[in-house]
Amino acid sequence: MAQESGINALGQFQLTTGFGAFGKAIEFTNSNEMMLLAAVIVTSLFVVALRQRALVPGRMQGLAEISYEFVHNMVLDTIGEEGKRFFPFVFTLFAFILIGNILGLFPYFFAFTSHIAITGALALFVFALSTLVGFWYHGIGFLKFFSPPGVPGWLLPLLIPIEIVSFLSRPISLSVRLFANITAGHVMWEVFAGFMLMLVSGLGAVGVVAAIIPLGLNIALTALEFLVAFLQAYVFAILTCLYLHDAIHMH
């Protein structure tokens, strides 16, 4: 029905082949291209911002310093002093996801964080890292993480499987949360925009007046999507910090 009426809200998530290399042996999709672009933007912004550091920072340097302090404080507050060694990873993850979310808000760009394969890969990497950190700090003693302290022995056969399932579900919840929020926002955006165009093309002058409502909703939704882009990057980063905290401190 949606496609018959001219609205294809899911078409924006379709993967298309862009350019290739080595005689098409390696092909880049629009998702790959946006990920490369996000990496280039993050790197370029900080290279330009910090190339000529001044005592009184300019706009670019100020933005870079605010971003640095924001993530640095988040890492220290969540993980503690041990978190300093993981700051580069968390900061890169936060910046990459944030820019990826924002890129998807512009016409002709693609939100690669709207694909579960991408968010799943990021979540699995975080899960693997936090697990390795746990064994690195505690060795085989990390398995005690699944045995909550102070629990009666007779309850352990029930609680340990629950703890294991909860632990293994972390990458699922982490990836689905980011994927679902970005996808839902873009679908609503497309539906309102399509509805507005249908009113204008189908009702003429009356449709132009009627389209004011979906236009206003689309403008409000656009502002909300920029906020969601930041919040989802923050949530992914803060949960990464929490998982690393659990691995280091065993609670």
Curated annotation (Swiss-Prot):
Keywords: ATP synthesis, Cell inner membrane, Cell membrane, CF(0), Hydrogen ion transport, Ion transport, Membrane, Transmembrane, Transmembrane helix, Transport
Subunit organization: F-type ATPases have 2 components, CF(1) - the catalytic core - and CF(0) - the membrane proton channel. CF(1) has five subunits: alpha(3), beta(3), gamma(1), delta(1), epsilon(1). CF(0) has three main subunits: a(1), b(2) and c(9-12). The alpha and beta chains form an alternating ring which encloses part of the gamma chain. CF(1) is attached to CF(0) by a central stalk formed by the gamma and epsilon chains, while a peripheral stalk is formed by the delta and b chains.
Residues passing through the membrane, by range: 30-50, 86-106, 116-136, 145-165, 195-215, 219-239
Highest taxon of the lineage: Bacteria
Gene3D superfamilies: ATP synthase, F0 complex, subunit A (1.20.120.220)
GO molecular function list: proton-transporting ATP synthase activity, rotational mechanism
Subcellular location: Cell inner membrane
Biological classification of the source: Bacteria, Pseudomonadati, Pseudomonadota, Alphaproteobacteria, Acetobacterales
Family: Belongs to the ATPase A chain family.
Gene Ontology cellular component list: plasma membrane; proton-transporting ATP synthase complex
Keyword Cell inner membrane among UniProt keywords: yes
Membrane topology (UniProt): Multi-pass membrane protein
Disulphide-bridged cysteine pairs: none
Role: Key component of the proton channel; it plays a direct role in the translocation of protons across the membrane.
Protein name, entry field: ATP synthase subunit a
